[in-house]
């Protein structure tokens, strides 16, 4: 089986879409680092050994030429590893799980040019930078100490997980190189801006639990279907545009939107069907549900509840009345030009 054939059989164990949130959101997978927990300063050197490799290798497959076989899957989780230099010799690996160790350096992975799937969660990495890996589809670096998004340029990368790191700003994600990237997970970082996420192929973007105050730089994401902004500090709904024509699910729970008038800024999203605004000050207004439907007639669900036909009919009446009132307003009188003076 060639690497091209194997692309369809890679093992994406991360969800591409956000589940509905009836309760406080639970993290996908284990929390490798509890809130406030610090990493120990030093660990005893623990290199990856041949014995560990024998225990962790599985999935025997044909190599590229079809004449030989090699194990292509490796799992060496929770081994207190500080060094994976030995991986340089295992060039046929396609699936690698090195999570829950104490790794600070991923450079040996640069030799794994057949790699399709990588999970390096819960280590001590400060960067996700690696050489360009031509077949890598899924990469997860959750719960490390990563501070930037530089050096990620794998052309077939589809899903990138950087949840639970220390990233303040997104930089270096080049849309001309990341031509297949459709899902980016940046939940639980320290992001202060949404600038730098200029990835036109992006479909799912998770930015919950950051320090965002507004949405900016996402206006041209025409393929985006899911945008998750829960638990930030957003108080305005500016930054959305008609170009975001595929957006169906928008989660703004736990932000600071106080003015119901902000909802009007979402009416240019033609496919928006589900909006979550729980735990925002504006939800205390008695006309909250009605105002949302008046502004967004195609909305199907607000927070946990779907709209009933009676609510839709009432919103239609209000919308029609507002339209008629606007049509009856006198046009503002234009100032006369000097040469048009009546004197």
From Swiss-Prot:
Annotated LRR repeat ranges: 92-113, 114-134, 135-155, 156-177, 180-200, 201-222, 223-244, 246-267
GO BP terms: flagellated sperm motility; radial spoke assembly
Keywords per UniProt: Cell projection, Cilium, Coiled coil, Cytoplasm, Cytoskeleton, Disease variant, Flagellum, Leucine-rich repeat, Repeat
Annotated localization: Cell projection, Cilium, Flagellum; Cytoplasm, Cytoskeleton, Flagellum axoneme; Cytoplasm
InterPro entries given in the database record: Leu-rich_rpt, LRR_dom_sf, SDS22/Internalin_LRR
Coiled-coil residue spans: 307-329
Compositionally biased intervals (Acidic residues): 1-30
Sequence ranges of Basic and acidic residues compositional bias: 318-337
Tissue-specific expression: Expressed in spermatozoa.
Limits of the LRRCT domain: 280-318
Chain residue ranges for the region called Disordered: 1-47, 318-343
SUPFAM superfamilies with a match to the protein in the record: L domain-like
Record-level GO cellular component terms: cytoplasm; cytoskeleton; cytosol; sperm flagellum
Pfam families, A to Z: LRR_9
Record region (Interaction with RSPH9): 208-343
Gene3D superfamilies associated with the record: Ribonuclease Inhibitor (3.80.10.10)
Known role: Essential for sperm motility and male fertility. Plays an important role in the proper assembly of the third radial spoke (RS3) head and the bridge structure between RS2 and RS3 in the sperm flagella.
Subunit structure and binding partners: Component of the axonemal radial spoke complex. Interacts with RSPH3. Interacts with RSPH9.
Disease per record: Spermatogenic failure 92: An autosomal recessive, male infertility disorder characterized by asthenozoospermia and defects of the radial spokes and doublet microtubules of sperm flagellum observed by ultrastructural analysis.
Protein name in the entry: Leucine-rich repeat-containing protein 23
Organism: Homo sapiens (Human)
Lineage: Eukaryota, Metazoa, Chordata, Craniata, Vertebrata
Gene of this entry: LRRC23
């Amino acid at each position: 089986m060639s690497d091209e054939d194997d692309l369809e059989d890679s093992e994406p164990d991360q969800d591409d879409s956000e589940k509905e949130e009836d309760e406080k959101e639970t993290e996908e997978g284990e929390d490798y680092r509890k809130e406030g927990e610090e990493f120990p300063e030093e660990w005893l050197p623990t290199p990856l050994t041949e014995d560990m490799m024998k225990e962790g290798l599985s999935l025997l497959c044909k190599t590229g030429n079809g004449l030989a076989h090699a194990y292509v899957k490796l799992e060496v989780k929770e081994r207190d590893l500080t060094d994976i230099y030995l991986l340089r010799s295992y060039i046929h690996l396609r699936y690698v799980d090195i999570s829950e160790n104490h790794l600070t350096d991923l450079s040996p992975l640069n030799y794994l040019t057949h790699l399709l799937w990588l999970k390096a969660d819960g280590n001590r990495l400060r960067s996700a930078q690696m050489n360009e890996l031509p077949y890598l589809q899924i990469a997860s670096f959750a719960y490390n100490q990563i501070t930037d998004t530089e050096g990620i340029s794998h052309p077939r990368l589809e899903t990138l997980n950087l949840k639970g790191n220390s990233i303040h700003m997104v930089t270096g994600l080049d849309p001309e190189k990341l031509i297949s990237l459709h899902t980016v997970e940046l939940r639980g970082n320290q992001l202060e801006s949404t600038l730098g996420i200029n990835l036109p192929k992006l479909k799912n973007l998770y930015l919950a639990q950051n320090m965002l105050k507004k949405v900016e730089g996402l206006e041209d994401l025409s393929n985006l279907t899911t945008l998750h902004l829960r638990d930030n500090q957003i108080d305005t709904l500016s930054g959305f545009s008609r170009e975001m024509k595929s957006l169906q699910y928008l989660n703004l729970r736990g932000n600071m939107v106080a003015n119901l008038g902000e909802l009007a800024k979402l009416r240019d999203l033609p496919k928006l069907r589900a909006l979550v605004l729980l735990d925002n000050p504006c939800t205390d207004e008695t006309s909250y549900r009605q105002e949302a439907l008046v502004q967004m007639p195609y909305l199907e669900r607000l927070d946990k509840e779907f709209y009933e036909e009676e609510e839709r009919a009432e919103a239609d009446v209000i919308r029609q009345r507002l339209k008629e009132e606007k049509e009856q307003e006198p046009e503002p009188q234009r100032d006369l030009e000097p040469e048009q003076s009546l004197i």
